[in-house]
């Protein structure tokens, strides 16, 4: 309650001060104030000291696109010690690449934290490749953590020196995916569910019908986890000079090693306290006079410097547009964390008609969603591809509707651990008949045609109505696989075999012909430049343009911290939050026909 009041008061205070400022000095004065702040920002911005170490916080949540911050949230960022832990993939990649060439940067420190990152493994794969390139440039990487988990260790294993606290541990216990089923709860509260679907592996409807995984869903999930776990082992092993068998043995025999056991197994290089690793970094950088520690700069601060350097070298006439499609695909404009069909289609049209944009990279990180919205976007992708190269870069997941919007491009890149496929269609129909009856509610209807009230939630659909909806689902599925066959130049009968709603890893998708290349966002950008014959003479522009004028103002502000960072969630609260996220997915189901092309609900891999 105390933290709630602090954040609420801070939000109200920020709003009040903003209004007071505007009322006192007027709009012109405010603009002048902003201009002065902008002109002085170069002097007050971050600086890199000679022989500094770039610090990458392993708890950062690496996303594709910039997070949208509400005004109140942005004010909280200013007042808080914690400005948020989200950072874009391109920010991380560009910073590491700049640091590799920067004579003032002598190494990278991967800083562990008690907070765990929620970054997807496909994004981590590309960051890891960038770190490996940094190491290959003969610049050292140090990594330290109290307790190493698999996600952090995936990056940490690339380091020249991996250290763990004497009382710490290292976890390598394999991947798991645990699904939540709502069937019992829906029955308890009187909510009815009916489904129509095509594809025996299209398991998105299972949480609402079953109480456990179907054999088909278990089979596909096991294969997917096996592919991703295999990629993990073959990636981590070589840097540590341990075999896949040795790593698997760790996972099969408890999965958690104490510090001394991790050292004995050659999975870490040192068992030390933080002050000891800091002393080692001081030997590399010398002592910073201000903070008495090693000379350092955080990745977020360094990114600001790297961005300023890039903007001065930009070629405005030769642009490669990176359009982000991140989140649930929904009909209409969509919210800030959704892929709105109309909004993204409009962005693609704008890019297509911009003569300065010579090529497009569509970055997809979506489980799918509305079939209608997916087709709206897919059409614009296809039209743009006829005018200029469109390259798709699949992120952590590009499944079902996410694949639909990708397949019309000129070339598709995916990481080995991208989750894709799920070529299937379903309809999900809720009714509140029992819930209403239990609470004394009734309905009556007057209609002019037999199917006039087919969209009502007052009763279940009758057999004729279900047959009509199933017919629509069947037709959309047939169109889906036909589009896949045409765009991927595959026989339709082969597409029918590999579709059925089944999810695939990027590696498997490449073997099946669903993607063209194994690679990340940087590879896709390079391919776009190659197809557009731009050489090195181009500038990258990101879409949609998300940062508002108001946010730019707030980002310039600095002040004394009056708030504490948000506390880490306890396990029970974290589990409740997961359940809320599962249920929130239902709110995004707004297809006008009630037909969806979507991955299994909130597939989680831990």
Name every feature range the model reports, one short phrase each.
Residues 147, 252-257, 398-399, 501-502:
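Short helix-initiation/N-cap motifs at beta->coil->alpha
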Residues 1-84, 90-92, 166, 176-259, ...:
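Intrinsically disordered, low-complexity segments enriched in small/flexible residues
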Residues 112-116, 247-250, 503:
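Surface-exposed aromatic
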């Amino acid at each position: 309650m105390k933290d709630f009041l602090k954040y609420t008061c801070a939000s109200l205070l920020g709003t009040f001060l903003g209004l007071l400022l505007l009322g006192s000095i007027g709009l012109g004065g405010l603009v002048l104030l902003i201009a002065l702040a902008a002109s002085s920002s170069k002097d007050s911005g971050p600086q890199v000291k000679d022989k500094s170490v770039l610090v990458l916080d392993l708890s950062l949540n690496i996303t594709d696109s910039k997070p949208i911050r509400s005004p109140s949230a942005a004010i909280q960022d200013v007042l808080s010690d914690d400005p948020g832990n989200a950072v874009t993939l391109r920010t991380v990649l560009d910073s590491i690449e700049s640091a590799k060439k920067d004579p003032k940067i002598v190494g990278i420190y991967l800083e562990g934290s008690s907070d765990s990152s929620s970054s997807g493994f496909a994004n981590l794969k590309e960051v890891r490749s960038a770190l490996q390139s940094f190491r290959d440039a003969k610049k050292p990487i140090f990594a330290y953590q109290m307790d190493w988990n698999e996600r952090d260790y995936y990056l940490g294993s690339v380091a020249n020196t991996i250290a763990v606290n004497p009382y710490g541990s290292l976890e390598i216990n394999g991947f798991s995916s645990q699904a939540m089923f709502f069937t019992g709860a829906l029955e308890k509260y009187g909510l009815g569910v009916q489904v129509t679907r095509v594809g025996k592996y299209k398991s998105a409807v299972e949480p609402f019908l079953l109480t456990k995984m179907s054999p088909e869903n278990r089979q596909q999930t096991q294969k997917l986890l096996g592919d991703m776990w295999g990629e993990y082992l073959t990636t981590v092993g070589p840097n540590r000079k341990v075999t896949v068998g040795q790593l698997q043995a760790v996972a099969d025999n408890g999965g958690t090693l104490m510090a001394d056991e991790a050292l004995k197994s050659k999975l870490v290089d040192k068992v030390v306290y933080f002050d000891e690793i800091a002393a080692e970094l001081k030997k590399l950088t010398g002592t910073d006079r201000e903070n008495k520690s090693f000379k350092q700069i955080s990745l977020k601060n360094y990114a600001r410097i790297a961005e300023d350097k890039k903007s001065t070298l930009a070629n405005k006439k030769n642009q490669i547009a990176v359009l982000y499609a991140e989140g649930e695909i929904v009909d209409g404009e969509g919210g800030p964390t959704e892929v709105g069909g109309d909004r993204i289609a409009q962005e693609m049209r704008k890019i297509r008609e911009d003569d300065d944009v010579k090529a497009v990279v569509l970055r997809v990180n979506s489980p799918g969603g509305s079939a209608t919205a997916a087709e709206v976007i897919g059409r614009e992708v296809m039209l743009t591809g006829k005018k200029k190269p469109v390259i798709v870069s699949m992120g952590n997941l590009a499944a079902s509707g996410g694949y639909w919007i990708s397949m019309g491009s000129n070339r598709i890149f995916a990481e080995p651990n991208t989750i894709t496929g799920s070529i299937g269609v379903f309809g999900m129909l809720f009714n509140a008949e029992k819930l209403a009856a239990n609470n004394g509610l009734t309905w009556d209807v007057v209609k002019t045609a037999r199917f006039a009230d087919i969209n009502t939630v007052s009763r279940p659909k009758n057999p004729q109505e279900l047959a009509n909806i199933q017919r629509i689902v069947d037709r959309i599925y047939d169109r889906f696989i036909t589009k896949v066959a045409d765009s991927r130049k595959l026989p339709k009968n082969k597409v029918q075999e590999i579709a059925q709603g089944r999810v695939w890893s990027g590696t498997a998708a490449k073997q099946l012909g669903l993607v063209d290349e194994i690679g990340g966002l940087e590879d896709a950008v390079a391919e776009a430049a190659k197809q557009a014959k731009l050489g090195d003479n181009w500038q990258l522009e990101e879409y949609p343009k998300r940062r508002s004028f108001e946010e730019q103002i707030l980002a310039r502000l600095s002040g004394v911290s009056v708030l504490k960072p948000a506390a880490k969630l306890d396990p029970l609260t974290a589990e409740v939050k997961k359940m809320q996220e599962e249920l929130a997915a239902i709110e995004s189901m707004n297809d006008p026909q009630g037909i969806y092309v979507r991955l299994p609900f909130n597939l989680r891999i831990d």
